[in-house]
Regions:
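Structural micro-motif
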Residues: 53-62
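Thiol-based oxidoreductase modules, predominantly thioredoxin-like and allied folds used
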Residues: 10, 33-47
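Non-catalytic, surface beta->alpha helical segment in thiol-disulfide oxidoreductase systems
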Residues: 63-96
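Residue-level recognition of oxygen-bearing side chains
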Residues: 20, 45, 78-81
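CheY-like receiver
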Residues: 49-52, 85
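Active-site loop signature of alpha/beta-hydrolase-fold enzymes
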Residues: 45, 58, 70
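Local sequence-structure signature of Cys/Sec-based thiol-disulfide redox active-site neighborhoods
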Residues: 1-31
C-alpha cells in the first residue's frame, strides 16, 4: 500500500496573503490523486504542531511523504510559480 503525500498549509487569521493563497493551493492540489491537503490555522490550539514543524511565518506550505518533509515554501507565491514548485516537489516525493 502506497503512502499518500501530504501538503500542509499554515496560515494566520489576519494574514491577507494566506487568504489569497488558499483557493489557489486548493485548486492546484486537487489535481493530484495521491495528495492530501490539510489547512492549519496558527493559533494557541495549534502551537504543538506549529512547533513540531518549526513554522516561523505564514503562509508556509509543507510537503511531507511518510511524515518526512520534502518541501517547504514560505510566503505568498503567484499561482504559476506555486504550480511549478508543487509539481517538482510532489514528483520528488513520489520517488521516495
Amino acid at each position: 500500500m502506497e503512502k499518500r503525500i501530504k501538503v500542509i498549509e499554515f496560515s494566520g487569521e489576519s494574514c491577507a496573503n494566506c487568504y489569497s493563497l488558499m483557493p489557489i493551493l486548493y485548486s492546484l492540489v486537487s489535481s493530484y490523486d495521491d495528495v492530501d491537503l490539510k489547512h492549519i490555522e496558527v493559533s494557541e490550539e495549534s502551537m504543538e504542531v506549529v512547533a513540531k514543524y518549526e513554522i516561523d511565518r505564514v503562509p508556509t506550505i509543507l510537503i511531507l511523504k511518510d511524515e518526512v518533509e520534502v518541501g517547504r515554501c514560505r510566503g505568498y507565491q503567484p499561482e504559476e510559480i506555486l504550480a511549478i514548485w508543487l509539481d517538482s516537489k510532489i514528483e520528488d516525493a513520489r520517488k521516495k
